Structures are given as C-alpha cells and as structure tokens.
C-alpha cells in the first residue's frame, strides 16, 4: 500500500510527516535514500526528503545533518531543513531541493572545466566550508558529490552549496571558561573519501579546519587536471602519492595563484584559524586578472560571443577562455566581509 515503508525504500505516493508526498526517488546509499517530495500544503513546492532506515544501522548520520542544518538556518547559501522526525522504522529530514552535484556535472561535461568555472565553484565551496566552521563543525567528507548547485528558479540557482554533513564532527567544546577547541585525539578512525582527504587523515590524525581545506585543494585541482591517484583504491598508496606530488604538478593546468593557495593551506596548522579571506582573495584575483565575471556562463552552459580582450591566455589556457557576460548582474556574489568574520574568536 502507498505509504508503507520497506527496508530500503518508500513507495511513490507515500506521505511523510502528514504533508510531504513522495513523487520521485533521487538516489540511494548505505545511509539511506533521497526522494523528491511535494508539499501537499503548498501546491508546486518541492523538497528533498532524506530517509535513514533503522535496518541499515547508519549510526544516526541523519541526526547529525539535522543538527547542523538547524544551526545554519540563518546563514545564506545553505540548504534549509524544513522538517524532520522519527517513525517506527526510519528517521527522515525534509530539506531544500538542490540541483545537479559537481560530481554529476564533471561526469557529464568534463572531465575538466574551464578556469572561470573552477574558481567560481572554488569560492562557493570555500564560503560553504567557512559557514560550517563558524558554527563549530568540520565537514570531514568534502568531495564533488557533496557539492551541488541551487535548484533552478531558486535564489541560489547560480551558487554551489556544500551538503551532506553525516560525517561532520564538532571541533569546539563548551568549557567553564568559554568555548574552546577540543583537544585532538592521538589516533582516529578513517573518515572521509580517500581521493580528497588530507594526508593527516591518511595517517589517522584528528581532523581540523585545515583538513576541509585540503579537500578543497584536491577538488580545485581535479576540475582542471586528472588527479594522479584517480584510479588508485588503496588508501596507503594514495596517501603516499599525495605526500610526494609537487604543487606544480597538482596544479599544472591551473592559474599560478593556485600555488599560493595550496601554500597557504599547507602553512595552516591544526589549531590555526584558516585565513579564509586570503584564500578568497587569491581566487578572486584569478577572476580579476582574466576579467572573469560571476555572470559568465558556466562551462556546461551555452557560450556567448567571446570577448578577445578577456581571453584566458594569460594562463596559457588555449582556446577555451573567458565567456562574455550574460544577463546576470556583474557584481560579485561574495565580498571580503563574507570571509573575514570570526564569530568563534579562534
């Protein structure tokens, strides 16, 4: 019967939370399933429904997601949790419906993207990372599959949002004399995805804010050049390859500013607050030098007439350079103020 919940799925037509009707299954993983649902109380309004079945023993991953999204509710450019609850056989969360993931876009339109797209996505991810860090959490599993565009027609349709906080961990503790960073454990279990995690995670050290930035480093590199360990499965071997690779090789097809970007990340220690503002300015400098605009079409969008004066040949990018701006506002989506605030004070 519609509405019955099996061990692995919900039927099309099932109603969750007395108002969210399942209309399409979007995906499935070891931690549950994702569905597109329609709000029966608001015609035409759709959301994403995440369901975590108790039979799958996912370890309350959904509970962590609800907790983080609830704390991010007042932040901009983040998915919103609009409802959550528990049933006898599953837990659920209703959240903002997003567009395609970066992973999907790379597979469909890649394997590589142009620099204008690379740096804009990089800025969006950097902002998303900072939003999570500012409420006292680490993501710990940043990868292209966990970054997605806003849904078409929404205010965030031109932004890329960070999502999937199931492996997140709080890095602050409320002690007698105020909020403090938690002391790192000597050794930890592996958390994350081997292709994108930091070398420190390969060594099973406690992850800090800087480790999320290392994931961004590898995502940025992969948007322009195949990672040397792309086809390697062994975690130890991947860790050794990351240790040995030179920055100039990692970012061989990227603007020179990326070398300063990775150098800045490398100089950041566990207890250090990352210099988000400096990292933002490095990516923004790429845009300024090549006259890239936030209104430019993304790599997979129809190209407008090229403007010869704004081609990317300053970086040796070949024929695929800057695209002429479309009809979107020319103003930057972000400002320095988005990256220099420090609500935690450390």
Curated annotation (Swiss-Prot):
InterPro entries: CK1_Ser-Thr_kinase, Kinase-like_dom_sf, Prot_kinase_dom, TTBK_Asator-like_STKc
Signal peptide annotation: none
Catalytic activity, EC: 2.7.11.1
GO CC, one annotated term: nucleus
CDD domains: STKc_TTBK
Sample GO molecular function, one term: ATP binding
Domain of life the protein comes from: Eukaryota
BP terms from Gene Ontology: signal transduction
Domain Protein kinase: start-end pairs: 20-287
Chain segments carrying region Disordered: 302-326
Principal EC category: transferase
Entries under Pfam families matching the protein: Pkinase
Keywords assigned: ATP-binding, Kinase, Nucleotide-binding, Serine/threonine-protein kinase, Transferase
Binding-site list for ATP: 26-34, 50
Reactions catalysed, as given in the entry: L-seryl-[protein] + ATP = O-phospho-L-seryl-[protein] + ADP + H(+); L-threonyl-[protein] + ATP = O-phospho-L-threonyl-[protein] + ADP + H(+)
Active site per the UniProt annotation: 141
Family of this protein: Belongs to the protein kinase superfamily. Ser/Thr protein kinase family.
Official protein name in the record: Putative serine/threonine-protein kinase K06H7.1
Organism of derivation: Caenorhabditis elegans
